Amino acid sequence: MSDPLNALILSGHMTREHDNEHRSFRQHNQWLTTLLEDTGRFRVRVIEDPRGLGAEIIDKYDVVLVVFEGRDGYHEKATGFGRETDEALLRFVHDRGKGMVWFHGSAAQEDDWGYPEEYNVMRGAKLSVPTGLRPRPWGEAQLDTVEPRHPITEGISARWTVTGDDILTGVELYDGAQVLITTFDDLESYENAPVWPMSHYPVAIPAEGIAALPGMNTDQPLAWINQYGAGRCFTITIGHDIDTFRRIEFIRMFPRGVEWAATGEVTLQGPDRRGERRFLPWPYYNREG
């Protein structure tokens, strides 16, 4: 296997959904680190205070993962990384040809938060309240792998499920983005939900009702990739809880997406669980990706 790719996780300021008395964003950081390093393809470091981070640190890495929301509560405005860090990250991808990964809620960006619009251009999409940002009703979600396949999704199930995840819909795709995974955002699930929207995650319902929400009854992107200048970006909005991390489809897809963002290529095959290897612990790679 090639020399390990150096991955940097930017984390540390999350909403109470991901940092409270029962769970911590550090669990996400640990799961991501374990999943990536167990492939044998990555060496991961985590920074919990990325505001003001400059190119002298960022440029040492091959790929940067964002696990950062910049606010304490859903109702609050986010405070971003700051100008120096924004400029360093944009150059890191666009000019230096490196990669970025936007994980789960970090993909959401409102116009009045102070993040540069260029991050949306990098991601190849916008996920915000005006575009229809909302969580689907809680429960099991059915995911579809988009055809034709990209090497990131080669060999994973055409249809699979996650349970207990925050399924964020309302993505406005930009030209050039390639969708990897979708879910059908069906009206029936909303109408049959015991409570929706939840009080901690308000949604402005149009006068015409839930059916008039943007993107209702359409396939909604949950993972996509985009070329940005000389570099690449991988965005994935699932991953709220450990159940998703245990799905073999996620175990195969996520490290490949990170590898593609870093290099533009996919070499990881996914864990082999045949024979005696079936006894290996999660995430099953044993550094033999």
Regions found by a protein language model. Give the residues of each.
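Solvent-exposed loop/turn segments at secondary-structure junctions
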Residues: 13-16, 50-52, 70-73, 106-110, ...
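Extracellular ligand-binding/catalytic regions of CAZymes and related secreted enzymes
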Residues: 2-4, 31, 189, 198-289
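Short, flexible/disordered intra-domain loops and linkers
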Residues: 16-26, 74-81, 113-115
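Alpha-helical scaffolding within the catalytic cores
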Residues: 47-53, 87, 217-223
